[in-house]
Amino acid sequence: MNMHLILLSLLCCASSAYADIWGDLSQAAQVAYTAPLNGEYVRQTRTGIDSFEIYRLRDKNTLTERRVAKSKAYEILRERDKISFYAANAQDLKAADTDESNRFPAVLPFFVQYLSESYEASYQGDGRIAGRTCHIVRLTPNDDNRYTQELCLDDTDNLPLSRIYLHNDIIVRADLFAALDRETLPVAAELTPTRGLNYTIERTLNEDFARLGENDTFIQSLPTGFRVAGYEQGTLGGYYLITDGLANITLFVEPVDNAHHQLPNIAKNGVFSTAARQSKKHHFTAIGDLPQDGLKRWLDSVEFAD
């Protein structure tokens, strides 16, 4: 598998890849892993800003979550390892099943930083993107100017930059944090799809993926609390998906003599950090939602059978 495609598919958090992606909660929110969640999340896409209402309830054995697309005519219901898409007609149902935004976890980002502390921002003038007039703001991470991205913000979304949070193309306005309610349990009606959405598709999350790495002996030891959630071998090397339930890290392993080593040239997304390490036989690259220095310490502490 082409390494670019591996990276893209992982960063998009495809719902079929592993079963507990929607179970992750925001480290920044400092809430318990079992906390309920009501509210809204907003993410920037190539065609504008998507917004979803979220109703989420989790206990020790069950996860129920309903997502209502505010600008699109469909809803999504997650119950344990089942994901169901609901729409009023076949066209909207197809859009719901293929929409890239549905591949993102319906929660707040895992690690959030103020833009004013992690980015240099510059106003690029007004523009028109996907039929929408907006203010173009260019954001450049202070630690690496190769990973610049531009945001399309209209008058409603154009808050002072210090009040906008960003992670993996997800924008969460500061005022939305106040609107998110993590204490009140969602009522039954909020966890039930709207009547009249009679077109449905049901998907089963692939839990086998999460078991692939359990018997792998290449990783000898991980930092406390982390586990291998999945592994896949590609044409240029392999990658591990590693998580502690809050942070998600992708660890790429490539042979040192691989003439097609490309990872340093792949642009990271949002405020994902990267760290690298090399042994005599392998080159290791970690991409994750930890602070840059924290990810480097994390990678240095992993023990390999190399």
Describe each region flagged by the PLM.
Residues 130-195:
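Gly/Pro-enriched, hydrophobic low-complexity segments
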Residues 197-280, 293-294:
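Short, solvent-exposed recognition patches
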Residues 2-9:
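Sec-dependent signal peptide recognition
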Residues 52-106, 162-184:
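An acidic-aromatic
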Residues 9-11, 16-61, 114-116, 126, ...:
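N-terminal leader/targeting segments and the immediate start of mature chains
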Residues 99-148:
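Intrinsically disordered, low-complexity linker/loop segments enriched in Gly/Pro
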Residues 34-40, 60-65, 131-138, 159-162, ...:
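Short, hydrophobic/aromatic-rich segments at coil-to-beta transitions
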Residues 49-53, 71-73, 145-149, 172-173, ...:
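Short, surface-exposed coil-to-beta transition loops
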